Amino acid sequence: MTAQPTQSVTWNDATARTVLRQLFDAAVRCADPGEAVRRHLPERPVGRCVVVGAGKAAAAMAAALDAAWPDVDVSGVVVTRHGHAGAAGHDASAPQQGGATASACTATSERPAASGSVAVAATGGIPVAGGLAAAGGTAAPSRITVLEAAHPVPDEASVRASRRILQAVQGLTPDDLVVALISGGGSSLLTLPAAGMTLADKQAVNRALLHSGATIHEMNVVRRQLSAIKGGRLAQAAMPARLCTLIVSDVPGDDPAIIASGPTVADLDGWLDVIGENRSVSDRETGGDTDRGSAGDADQARRPEVAGAASADPQAQAREIVARYGMQLPPAALQVLDTPQPPVRPHPDHTLHIIAAPMMSLQAAASAARDLGLTPLILGDALEGEATQMGTVLAGIGRAVALYGQPLPAPAVLLSGGEATVTIGPQGAGRGGRNTECLLAMALALGAQRGVWALAADTDGIDGTEDAAGALISPDTLQRARAAGLDPRRFLQDHDSYSFFAALNDLLVTGPTGTNVNDFRAILIA
């Protein structure tokens, strides 16, 4: 059923909030990892199929593959964030509008039932009864084990899971197939310290990266060099089996070497990077698969400078990033970066598909907005920078639409993706995430501007380390805050945006969505 034209809608706070939630839900539904996996199943193997993977969408991806191949010899292990093992799909509370999601991302909004042959396991790797239940409601024998570990700072469970994954791909033959299911969050979940480093060293590195203000590209360039499993090392361990990597992208530009720090993508792979002018509009509209056979089969395309070209020294790049942000890394990590390492060999029989990505979800939200009578404008899927600065800039664009009808007239919605950063100073931080911090800065910049509402949230359902996906703001946000005795500037200064929005009851709480295509921001002007 098509929504009524906006001209017949009375825009009030409740309506605007409902519409923003509908747009967020459309974006998340489009990134349904199970549906995406089913659309990109590789050729069946002659021998065994070993499934490995890491990320916030790993459980749903594994369940979909397992259910699709009941007659194939499937086994394996994947790792996801604590509490995400049962997140087989997004349960949108807002009603779906007009089937816009299906047209925008070539996916349906139907949610798959969890496969009965994927079992949730404790951190020790022992299947837990009644994990992901079969359709009949009882747990079935496990073929793919789902482990849980910590995010964003790894724990001992991350190390155990990584060892299990490496063990799973040992001793295979060219007749066997390894399917690597990679999604956002994998950099922490897939943790195996490089020789000479300990878990404590890796934890210290992660904290330094998270507090530095570095972009996700820069952080993962460093992580790749300090790991015994990332940076193509998982692919190298899987030889001589055939390898297929299915990726749900959560990084600006969809660079497969950066997503989860590229466990199956070596520095010398020369993978085609799906960014900027190197990716056509038609690729964006169809999901932009990056389908590759041998690493040398396609033309080399430019990566973002920070990620480096294939000819650059990745260790030197990592050292430069550490120096640029003044990171204090453990001596063992610095020693690894200073010691020349043998190059990781690219896998000779590797196919890679990016099966869901931020731009696909933004287009799904834009389609839903049009069905609601709004004019959408996608500002981009790769917005980066300090969360406070991003919020201020986005507020300026929203104000221009409200006051001058530029760059487009109201009623309209401005959509964007990417990943903001939050630089934590020596004074420490309160409770917050990059999306709530961006929104708080936006609210301050907008002031009491009439007719502007906004939502910013992480599509995985968790903004930072808190239990909310993000939050919403409205024209009366600052007025309500001051009436409650809250000083919004102090909350922003203390990086305590979660507490600010919690006090106003403006947090967006979804629970784990089972997918992750980075941040989603929508500014509604009516």
Task: List each language-model region with its residue ranges.
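N-terminal amphipathic/basic leader segments beginning at the initiator methionine
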Residues: 2-48, 52, 85, 258, ...
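N-terminal glycine-/serine-/threonine-rich phosphate-binding loop
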Residues: 2-50, 59-71, 77, 131, ...
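Intrinsically disordered, low-complexity terminal tails and inter-domain linkers enriched
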Residues: 4-7, 83-141, 271-312
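Glycine-rich oxoanion-binding loops at beta->alpha junctions
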Residues: 82-87, 136-174, 222-223
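Gly/Ser/Thr-rich active-site loops/lids in small-molecule metabolic enzymes
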Residues: 197-215, 268-271, 299, 304-324, ...
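A glycine/threonine-rich phosphate-anchoring loop and its flanking beta-alpha core
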Residues: 210, 216-274, 288-317
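Accessory alpha-helical/coil subdomains and C-terminal extensions
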Residues: 241, 266-274, 296-393
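Internal helix-turn-beta structural module
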Residues: 437-526
